[in-house]
Amino acid sequence: MTANRLTLSGTVCKAPMRKVSPSGIPHCQFVLEHRSQQVEAGFNRQVWCRMPVIISGKAHQAITQSITVGTQLTVQGFICSHQGRNGLNKMVLHAEQIELIDSGD
């Protein structure tokens, strides 16, 4: 199996951390909070999640500089398990496309 795609929209809820790897690749990490109403088995359901997101590479560096807490985004990429310092695994979205959502203000 090779299918692994996720598209998620939401609001950045934790301040982005920006760093550059020893090989010179820029990385931006943040947490995206998603809230929506979905239909499941014919019933409306309120859904909510927080997804850690990593976006890497110089091609995305300009757009990641404009990301702050409260920024609304749609991201698309693949999911991967990362082991934290506490030894627990967490799901992380590795974004390959990122789009700022105009809030209309």
Curated annotation (Swiss-Prot):
GO CC field: primosome complex
Keywords: DNA replication, DNA-binding, Primosome
GO BP, sorted A to Z: DNA replication, synthesis of primer
Domain SSB: 1-102
Domain of life: Bacteria
SUPFAM superfamilies assigned: Nucleic acid-binding proteins
Alphabetized GO MF terms: single-stranded DNA binding
The keyword DNA-binding is assigned to this record: yes
Function: Involved in the restart of stalled replication forks, which reloads the replicative helicase on sites other than the origin of replication; the PriA-PriB pathway is the major replication restart pathway. During primosome assembly it facilitates complex formation between PriA and DnaT on DNA; stabilizes PriA on DNA. Stimulates the DNA unwinding activity of PriA helicase.
Subunit organization: Homodimer. Interacts with PriA and DnaT. Component of the replication restart primosome. Primosome assembly occurs via a 'hand-off' mechanism. PriA binds to replication forks, subsequently PriB then DnaT bind; DnaT then displaces ssDNA to generate the helicase loading substrate.
Family: Belongs to the PriB family.
HAMAP family (UniProt xref): PriB
Protein name in the entry: Replication restart protein PriB
Organism: Erwinia tasmaniensis (strain DSM 17950 / CFBP 7177 / CIP 109463 / NCPPB 4357 / Et1/99)
